[in-house]
């Protein structure tokens, strides 16, 4: 693939409109992360308009963090709208294995053909129908334990699958890439995983999904590394992280991205 900086440069030049159906905890954080990176967020979730809006946006992201029947209607309408308009959409199957309600929702959204699926190891294992030790939205499984399931899920769904953790794994069922960028402070700030899904959507709006997803993970992780250089804890890290997303240059991303073929 081209240098990751090329993907960042394209995303910033095009400033894609990304429709984000995310959870109550994450909404403000996701919007600020996308704005800092150079995209344009729209938090449009109600079924009355979500499907219509998905045809206007350049990408859609759906996060299952706090589902309710009305929000589920909006998710499904948006996914159908994105598919009909040929727009990429990203599924974040938060805690998909935790309850029967979430398992059913995950299966229905998967049937609507996401372009990219981004989750932690336990979520990807559960979505693929494999045994998992996940606890709620947190992963109790290592990324390596989900790599084979991710490949099977990519093959069966046609989606690019990203398993995120200390070292991320991305596959389209044929190819694989690992990304080692990131910092231990990142999981100490709520909604950064949800925000990563938004960034993947922004990158996938402008470039092919496999390469765009890998570049998005490297960008997000490297911004975390840069933010940690000045942060003294999770609070200052969150502010520094937004600044790093805004200031990180394509050239710096090319130098700092730690990607390798898997």
Swiss-Prot record:
Q: Which residues bind substrate?
A: 43, 191
Q: Which GO terms describe its molecular function?
A: ATP binding; hydroxyethylthiazole kinase activity; magnesium ion binding
GO terms classed as biological process: thiamine biosynthetic process; thiamine diphosphate biosynthetic process
Query: Catalyzes what?
Result: 5-(2-hydroxyethyl)-4-methylthiazole + ATP = 4-methyl-5-(2-phosphooxyethyl)-thiazole + ADP + H(+)
Task: Identify the residues that bind ATP.
Answer: 118, 164
**Keyword entries, A-Z:** ATP-binding, Kinase, Magnesium, Metal-binding, Nucleotide-binding, Thiamine biosynthesis, Transferase
This protein's cofactor list reads: Mg(2+)
This protein's superkingdom? Bacteria
Q: What is this protein called?
A: Hydroxyethylthiazole kinase
CDD domains xrefs = THZ_kinase
Organism name: Cereibacter sphaeroides (strain ATCC 17023 / DSM 158 / JCM 6121 / CCUG 31486 / LMG 2827 / NBRC 12203 / NCIMB 8253 / ATH 2.4.1.)
User: Looking at the keywords, is Transferase present?
Assistant: yes
List the taxonomic lineage.
Bacteria, Pseudomonadati, Pseudomonadota, Alphaproteobacteria, Rhodobacterales
Matches recorded under SUPFAM superfamilies = Ribokinase-like
Keyword ATP-binding listed? The answer is: yes
Role this protein plays: Catalyzes the phosphorylation of the hydroxyl group of 4-methyl-5-beta-hydroxyethylthiazole (THZ).
In the UniProt record, the gene name given for this protein reads thiM
**Family of the protein in this entry:** Belongs to the Thz kinase family.
Q: Which HAMAP family match?
A: Thz_kinase
Q: Which pathway is this protein engaged in?
A: Cofactor biosynthesis; thiamine diphosphate biosynthesis; 4-methyl-5-(2-phosphoethyl)-thiazole from 5-(2-hydroxyethyl)-4-methylthiazole: step 1/1
Tell me which EC number(s) this protein carries: 2.7.1.50
Enzyme class, spelled out: transferase
